[in-house]
Amino acid sequence: MVKQVEWDWTGAEQEYRRAIELNPSYAMARISYAIHIYALQRFEEAAAQAERAQQLDPVSPFVNTWAGAAYFFAGRVEDARASLQRVLELEPSYSDASLVFARNYVSKAMYQEAIVELQTALTFNATEPFVLGALAHVYGRVGRVEDGLKLVGELKRIDAERGNVPMSPFPFVWAYAGLGDKDQAFVWLERSYQQRRQRMVWLNVDPLLGPLRSDARLHDLVRRMGLPTNSPPPPG
């Protein structure tokens, strides 16, 4: 949605609501709206929209993955687990489901479970940048700094090979946040802000930004984006 890319949160919500009014049975409209209000920390509303999307399209990996995110932060932990497991049973290589699973684990400080989930995802695609960045983050959280830095090196290699089509800055943000290098994390986060990367919309809810949560630089980014803050951030 254009309004979300422009960080016009009210306008984006109006667009999503209008899309649902035009076609109430369109699962993608409902899960997209769920993702939007999840980013705004309206977790129970997001879970309700995600549940309706699942009813409309029960086998969609995209729908089930983001339902898993919405359910988790609405306190429906078992529903979240079931949704994500459903995705990975049908499509084990669907890395977004592994990422959401891992982020949910990080929220609960279940770091070993997160590591297993991400390592499994890498068996299907060993160069998936977001999985590498998330795993580097978790390695940092458990003191495996050298292992995390090796993954940062791999990310740099992948980025360099892309030439004029650089990858998203977010894998670096996650990695450096977990490894305790806040200055580098904010260098890449600022780059993501300047590029208006889609993952910026989750600034208030991303557990992999947990180590940055109290930093004034994160608060400044939230302010510049005009992101509403409706509840305490999730742990991370």
Predicted segment positions?
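Membrane-interface transmembrane helices that cradle and orient dolichyl/undecaprenyl
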Residues: 3
